[in-house]
A protein has these predicted regions:
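Non-catalytic, solvent-exposed segments at the cell envelope interface
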Residues: 2-247
Length: 247
């Protein structure tokens, strides 16, 4: 059989070499993507460890809850309640607290509540308002005051006012809207211990349990006084009743 000298001969190793080259390319791309993903997460405001102190300060023992409940004449539910504290700040000043919303997901009763806490008030026996302690101590100041009032916090999300509005709109429209609004939500988040998937999961669970912008529960305040004058106070037991840790 005649073989043309100008046509290259096929090598038995040619396919093996090609496969090896492709494998190297895929591995290189995978390593690059992994590296970029790691860098993005390291510098991300989501899944941040900067809020670890705030969450650690929000731990409440069953005994503390029982003491507050006994003093108020109510009963601890014993339910497993996951509380996410959404600290809302001014769009133009992240150091100014303009709102505090607690999303309480009761896994035992399979229900949820969204509780709005007045930031110009003090919780329980606190000596300063929530807005004041945020200005001086950040998120930890707020969670510490809540914990002192027997209100545990599992997660903390600091958002701007526009970010909170986007979150509520998306949560009310369902899971698909949450995914579509990812960019708007991310832009409105200042800091969160939850990563993107965790935040999405909270939104979906809250929405499926019936939480919406129309279902926000307000906590009543009462006027109290000390040596410095009068102030507004949130009763710890009333707040616990609202989130479901007491009944």
């Amino acid at each position: 059989m005649y073989e043309r000298p100008d046509v290259p001969k096929l090598s038995a190793n040619r396919n093996v070499i090609a496969a090896a080259v492709i494998a190297v390319v895929f591995v290189s791309v995978a390593l690059l993507v992994t590296h970029l993903w790691r860098l993005a997460n390291e510098h991300s405001k989501l899944g941040s460890s900067k809020l670890s102190d705030a969450i650690a300060a929000a731990t409440v023992s069953p005994d503390a809850i029982a003491q507050v409940a006994e003093a108020a004449g109510v009963t601890p539910t014993g339910d497993t309640v996951e509380v996410v504290a959404f600290l809302v700040t001014a769009d133009d000043d992240e150091k100014t607290l303009t709102g505090l919303n607690l999303a309480a997901i009761d896994d035992t009763q399979e229900k949820a509540a969204l509780v709005s806490v007045p930031i110009d008030a003090r919780v329980g026996t606190a000596t300063a308002s929530l807005a004041s302690v945020y200005a001086s101590g950040g998120a930890k100041g707020v969670t510490s005051q809540l914990a002192a009032g027997a209100v545990p916090v599992s997660h903390v999300v600091v958002m701007t006012e526009s970010g909170w509005g986007a979150f509520m709109e998306a949560a009310q429209s369902g899971a698909s809207a949450l995914k579509r609004s990812a960019t708007r939500l991310l832009d409105g988040i200042v800091l969160s211990d939850l990563d993107a998937q965790g935040l999405l999961d909270i939104g979906q669970r809250a929405a499926s349990a019936g939480i919406s912008a129309d279902s926000v529960v307000g906590v009543p305040t009462a006027e109290a006084s000390d040596a410095a004058g009068t102030y507004q106070q949130v009763d710890s037991a009333q707040l616990a009743l609202a989130i479901g840790t007491m009944a």
